[in-house]
């Protein structure tokens, strides 16, 4: 663990084993923190906050750029950890590293986006709005793209002057936190500005509770399941603390009648099966105009069956393992439930160990668990539609709204549909998986609240203060005058 600029053991000296789905074996021994360790990290971040907040935008930007350089320098080692610890395909590991570095370099622009405002005011009064950082921010990140999401969130939070305590997922303590802490150490970032606390599932509840309830914590950033996000939001709300959350998704791709089918198949395959479908913005539903549904489906099935499954160190085999046996069981339950209730399997449906075949379903109905609930694995359903209004009604009826995509013959036609999709993000003539470092990233409905990136990070992780200066012309009632 990394607390106050030092590598420390858990106070209890307890450890847990970090599991590798690639090798189906333990990967590393990790210190297992409890509430006391998190309190220590929060205290360190609190003490570091005044000096960090007082730095100029140029000084904070310089530190963030040094973090990016340190990640780049250690890139080969980090990529190896991404493959071994969470089962990233080698192509994904390189992409995760590249995008993570980009978040820190883009984050160096965010300090300059914090703008004060001068308000029109009565004569004799100077009125202004000042933005200031919040203080210590708790950051909780998931295992599926750990370095990417830890970088996406913390870069903006630190850029505007806050300090951070980060708890990576128990499934990805190395790639979600430890390698990032090493970059902060190498970059010479002042002690206490960025702290990493690791823990096992056994201690998640107490450590997480401390990250919300500790009075020194001023805001919480959480990326993970909607169920846990709701619990955190409820507790934080009772304490009047700001929250920003990116939660589950049930993201839809619409393929209109004049879409380029080849591009649509490519976008669908990447969106549905990248990282074995373990992506929050991955494609889980494909709505295809019935006029082209047969051709699209046939070509999509052929592409899906051709995808390589196996050793993720091999660039030709992009479909790797699910993260753990519990994830496998959940996917199997959703698939069996769908089949038992009448769904048809057009491709896949089998597994060998944690390696689950890319799977395509049709005839999925509302009674099936996979219809409206998040599916965190390589299963996608195809829904032919008659009218776009019908497709939009079904898409928007689901409680999630993270990402979406529309494929059509013209951008204008697709844009009209995109504007009617209830999702925080939507991509025209592209797939659901896409991001840019300074763009606002986040969802609506049960997919979260708040945004990350660029000016959105400024809005989410600073507070407005109204300051006035009286210049001697205000008149009080005479009985109050001295």
What does each model-found stretch correspond to?
Residues 116-263, 385:
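Rossmann-like NAD(P) dinucleotide-binding subdomain of oxidoreductase/dehydrogenase enzymes
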Residues 24, 60, 82, 161, ...:
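Residue-level signal for inorganic ion chemistry
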Residues 25-29, 217, 254, 308, ...:
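Conserved C-terminal structural/oligomerization subdomain of aldehyde/semialdehyde dehydrogenase
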Residues 188, 219, 227-365, 388-389, ...:
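ALDH superfamily catalytic-core signature
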Residues 21, 35-38, 57, 75, ...:
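Residues at or immediately preceding the N-termini of alpha-helices
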Residues 1-125:
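N-terminal Rossmann-like NAD(P)+-binding subdomain of aldehyde/semialdehyde dehydrogenases
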Residues 26-33, 48-54, 138-139, 253-256, ...:
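Short, well-ordered beta-strand elements within core beta-sheets of diverse protein domains
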Residues 49, 53, 68-75, 79, ...:
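Structural signal for hydrophobic packing residues in well-ordered secondary-structure cores
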């Amino acid at each position: 663990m990394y607390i106050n600029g030092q590598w420390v053991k858990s106070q209890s000296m307890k450890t847990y084993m970090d599991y590798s789905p690639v090798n189906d074996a333990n990967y590393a021994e990790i210190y297992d923190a409890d509430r006391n360790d998190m309190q220590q990290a929060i205290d360190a971040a609190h003490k570091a906050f005044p000096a960090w907040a007082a730095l100029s935008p140029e000084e904070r930007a310089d530190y963030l750029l040094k973090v990016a350089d340190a990640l780049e320098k250690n890139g080969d080692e980090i990529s190896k950890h991404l493959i071994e610890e969470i089962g990233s395909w080698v192509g994904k590991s390189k992409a995760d590293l590249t995008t993570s570095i980009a978040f820190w370099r883009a984050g160096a622009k965010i300090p300059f986006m914090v703008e004060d405002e001068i308000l029109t005011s009565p004569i004799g009064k100077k009125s202004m709005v000042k933005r200031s950082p919040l203080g210590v921010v708790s950051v909780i990140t998931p295992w599926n793209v750990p370095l990417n999401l830890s970088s996406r969130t913390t870069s903006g939070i630190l850029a505007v002057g806050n300090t951070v305590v980060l708890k990576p997922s128990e499934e990805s303590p190395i790639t979600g936190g430890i390698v990032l802490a090493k970059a902060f150490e190498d970059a010479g970032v002042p002690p206490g500005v960025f702290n990493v606390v690791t823990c096992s599932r056994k201690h998640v509840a107490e450590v997480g509770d401390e990250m919300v309830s500790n009075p020194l914590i001023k805001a919480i950033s959480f990326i993970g399941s909607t169920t846990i996000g709701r619990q955190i939001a409820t507790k934080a709300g009772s304490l009047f603390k700001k929250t920003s959350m990116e939660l589950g998704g049930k993201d839809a791709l619409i393929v209109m009648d004049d879409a380029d089918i080849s591009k649509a198949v490519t976008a669908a395959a990447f969106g549905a099966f990248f990282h074995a479908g373990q992506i929050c913005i991955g494609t889980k539903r494909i709505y295809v105009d019935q006029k082209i549904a047969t051709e699209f489906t046939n070509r999509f099935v052929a592409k899906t069956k051709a995808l390589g499954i196996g050793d993720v160190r091999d660039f030709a085999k992009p479909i790797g393992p699910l993260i753990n046996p519990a994830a496998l069981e959940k996917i199997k339950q959703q698939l069996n439930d769908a089949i038992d209730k009448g769904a048809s399997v057009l491709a896949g449906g089998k597994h060998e160990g944690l390696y689950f075949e890319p799977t395509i379903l049709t005839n999925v109905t509302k009674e099936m668990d996979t219809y409206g609930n998040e599916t965190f694995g390589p299963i996608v359903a195809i829904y032919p539609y008659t009218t776009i209004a019908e497709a939009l009604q079904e898409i928007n009826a689901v409680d999630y709204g993270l990402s979406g995509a529309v494929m059509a013959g013209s951008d204008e036609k697709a844009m009209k549909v995109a504007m009617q999709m209830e999702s925080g993000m939507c991509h025209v003539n592209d797939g659901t998986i896409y991001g840019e470092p300074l763009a606002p990233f986040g969802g609506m409905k049960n997919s979260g609240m708040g945004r990350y990136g660029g000016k959105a990070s400024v809005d989410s992780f600073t507070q407005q203060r109204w300051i006035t200066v009286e210049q001697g012309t205000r008149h009080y009632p005479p009985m109050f005058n001295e």
